[in-house]
Amino acid sequence: MWRDTPGAMWRDTPGVRWRLAAPRPVDDPALFLTRLRAEAQGAPVALGLDLPLGVPRAYAARRPEAGFLPFLDTIRAWPDFFRVCAAVPEIHPERPFYPARGIKGMTRAAHAAALGFAGAGDLSRLCDRATPERPAGAPLFWTLGANQSGKAAIAAWRDMLLPALARERSLVRLWPFEGRFRALLAPGTVTLAETYPAEASRHLGLRLRGSKRRQSDRAAAAPALLAAMARLNVAPEPALVLAVTDGLGSDAAGEDRFDCLLGVLCVINVLEGHRPDGTPDDPWLTSWEGWVLGQTAVPETVARSGRRPAR
């Protein structure tokens, strides 16, 4: 979850390449990336975000922009883009998020039809779809349910990403739209990449028994998490070891802290060269849809749009 982030810092120490701090809340989202760059003292910052970075190709096919990055510039002038629709008649391309609350007759098929899509499957990006290794993620524009990601995208894009891009565009880089992940890392910059906890746990060889919403089940995963850190030459701070052993807290934010930890380990896993830092060979991914960092499994069923994106 982008609102809580564990800090990882590279260290050239024998047997230790990374030191990992416990997750902490983000204070001012608009200045979050600036603060990370300041704390890095000129070193490159790599940041994994558990939320969508990109839009589905069925939506993108109707846009005049060349890709997701210029699209972000466009929506800055759309006052209602982030206002979630309460009813289907309110849905249109400049106000695509739905629904504001659960109501009778609410379906993803109706949502898709209101956006001019052929079916509910068009709401999903390729990386949202189920693979042989994990279940499907939720579509970007859908905002209801425990598994939805729309509200996180709204908060992060509106309150963190757009302000940062407006203030310091040359210092903020988005993967995979601007290149391979490791190649984007440069002194004084911050590079953002989408991560997905269900994907990251498989990259790290973790098999959570039970539910990550339960503290006891998260605590039971502590030995595997600490072992994954050791394999990656990560030295967790004592406070983090205690938190992981305790299941990352008894409050509702414990699940978010758990996902944060998976996300930062996913990023380190890629930086260490254990997972690829690119995408499958599909121009939609690097222009509009984005991809999940480190993912190699590709869904068998792919929704095809009517035109190819601009290269």
Where are these regions (language model features)?
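RNase H-like (RuvC/DEDD) metal-dependent nuclease/polynucleotide-processing core
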Residues: 1-10, 15-46, 51-311
